[in-house]
Amino acid sequence: MTLKDLPIGKTATVTTVGGEGALRQHFLDMGLIPKADVTMVKFAPMGDPVEVRIHGYELTLRLADAEKIEIDKIRDTITEPMRPQGARPIFHPGLGEGGKYHVQTGEPLPPGETLTFALAGNQNCGKTTLFNQLTGSNQHVGNFPGVTVDRKDGAIRGVENTLVTDLPGIYSMSPYSSEELVTRRFVLDEHPRGIINIVDATNIERNLYLTMQLMELDVPMVLALNMMDEVRQNGGSVRVNEMEEMLGIPVVPISAAKNEGIEELIDHAVHVAKYREAPGRQDFCDVNDHNGAVHRCLHGIMSLIEDHAYDAGIPVRFAASKLAEGDQLVLDRLNLDQNEKETLEHIITQMEKERGLDRAAAIADMRFSFIQKVCGATVVKPKESREHARSVAIDRILTGKYTAIPAFIGIMGLVFWLTFNVIGAFLSNLLDMGIGALTDIVDRGMTAANVNPVLHSLVIDGIFTGVGSVLSFLPVIVTLFFFLSMLEDSGYMARVAFVMDKLLRKIGLSGRSVVPMLIGFGCTVPGVMASRTLPSERDRKMTILLTPFMSCSAKLPIYSFFAAAFFPGKGALVMVILYFTGILVGILMALLMRGTMFKGEAVPFVMELPNYRMPGAKNVAQLLWEKAKDFLQRAFTVIFVATIIIWFLQTFDLRFNIVSDSKDSILAVIAGWIAPIFSPLGFGDWRISTALITGFMAKESVVSTLTVLFGSSTALATLLTPLSAASLLVFCLLYTPCVAAIASVKRELGGKWAAGVVIGQCVIAWLMAGLVYGMGSLFI
């Protein structure tokens, strides 16, 4: 029987894990190992993927992958609280554990030397929150796997000569995805002085798997038990001193969200790094397990490769365990000769025979066996946490078979309605009135002061009209980001990926691709960067190329501007139509890509589902401030400069004389060359062509340029009909993203792909806008 056939609510024991390569290794690293108990929680609304519970946390995988995992001993699920037995008093030895558990690897570092730390941990364990507490930085914090997609650096507040690097969240040191490679390369190649390993205390079993691999690196290390406040609230606890003794490293209970225990963590981290106190334990084998098969294997490999590991700069214990599980990248770096490779294979094959498991499963089993001993002796866990019980209740609706899709549509519809018709629209009108009043005051003041007419025109017709028109849409953008950050912080985004996986698979993507694309509704740049969390290069490229079709918030001023001018009272409907048009075109492009450039199937859907959490007010406020600040910076830099340039080109002719009619200006001459391209679309006016060009710098510039050139939406309404306005909206929706987004695509995929995005989306936008205008002309 396979895991695919396990009934909901039943528990079984894993017997074998099929498959091959990096995916199988990833399953083993996530805890799907022989003898592990696994519970079937539920099926996705469309029947695939499934959610299972293993080692105390929820994991999603597809039926095709579940079919590769064989099980037996099917039984009813019984959840028991974890209570350590035979406890004995263990006293805390002091700062840095007083060297009690450590091996000093060298002389203390000289004063003034920079202490570099790697901040490493599983995805969604509070790592970025801790980084912000340590450094005072304001990095993005979320409640779904894959928030950190690049390394970020910062100095520890109040401690000189320190540098902490926030690395992407990983489950193991196996190279399954690009973020795991980033973390692994940093630790192995850049040699940090210390490692701060953050662990989710509500799920220690899963998190300690990475801890054991980090300890094998022989780098001074501190373990931060995060979310201890939740553990205590649920009646659980961790016997910290006993855990320190068993692991051989300092263990510090903290709550990063509440800033508890951070100072003690800093003291321990600085101490072990400064005095070069490496972990006191790196051998996790049981010499009595299957006659010490794994133990003899690892020590035999260590003897064989010791000199090679030293030359390659890889800790010998880490290299031995990775070779034993079949890590090809480590094998390539060691440069073993043919005889040594044959000896290595003989050692591992002998271990497999004695152990009764293949090499990867044997090493994973060795690690989880040690973890179970540690947790059994040190962790007090309730039968079920309040957070988990609450998540199960909420998921009955948000991931239910008949309620998940309607709930998603309802939630997104509510977000758009509140943003564009209620909160955002109300605040935007207030700000617009304020900007208008300020413009009148400045206008009257400059007129009274008899300011030069050219300068007067620059300030009022250029800066105030252009920048002011964009600023009035700030509340709409902030409101949308508020709701998106609430959904992200709560953990709902991960559920959307779970619900949508089967649907996205039909167009060649994984459910995990939905997260970068949802982020793309806020801004394309972080959406493109978030694609790094995808383990498949094929999926990553497809997701990057499709994300620009998701309408970003910078286009909201364009939609609002035209909706107010041509479709009054129907703003929300216009927004919904445009957003769904972008999604539909993205789907069509995905199908085209799947059949041409990116043939093949999407990678397996393996993702952790975090518990729902109440979004932190500080995190939400921080994100809103960042987005507002970014918008204001763009308004007073790119848009400000673009507005002045447009005003100048519109005000003067080729001989730099002031023109009485803007159609005689420099701008009219330049844009006149391009305008005929858009005539078949219903907006072949040079002023609109100019606005579209400036939109490449920043989408908000489209509105500021039109306002400068036309003076008001009323003048624009005399030029365009509602049909041509609809055609223009579709073009703005689909044509090339802004220069910042193109730069991010270039950084991820290279210059050829970035150029392809610019040209391809302009062509698609032209065709779709022409289709709208042509079809509309037949019926209107």
Give names to the regions the model predicted.
Residues 231-286:
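Canonical P-loop GTPase G-domain recognition
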Residues 354, 361-362, 381, 422-463, ...:
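Extended, low-charge hydrophobic alpha-helical regions
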Residues 248, 275, 282-451, 658, ...:
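Extended helical scaffolds that flank P-loop GTPase cores
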Residues 90-172, 190:
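Conserved G1/Walker A P-loop phosphate-binding module
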Residues 549, 553-576, 740-750, 771-780:
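Transmembrane helix-loop junctions at the membrane interface of multipass transporters and ion channels
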Residues 407-418, 480-485, 563-565, 578-592, ...:
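Hydrophobic core segments of alpha-helical transmembrane domains in multi-pass membrane transport
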Residues 433, 437-441, 494-524, 599-623, ...:
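Juxtamembrane inter-helical linkers in multi-pass membrane proteins
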Residues 159, 184-251, 558:
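Conserved C-terminal guanine-recognition region of P-loop GTPase G domains, centered on the G4
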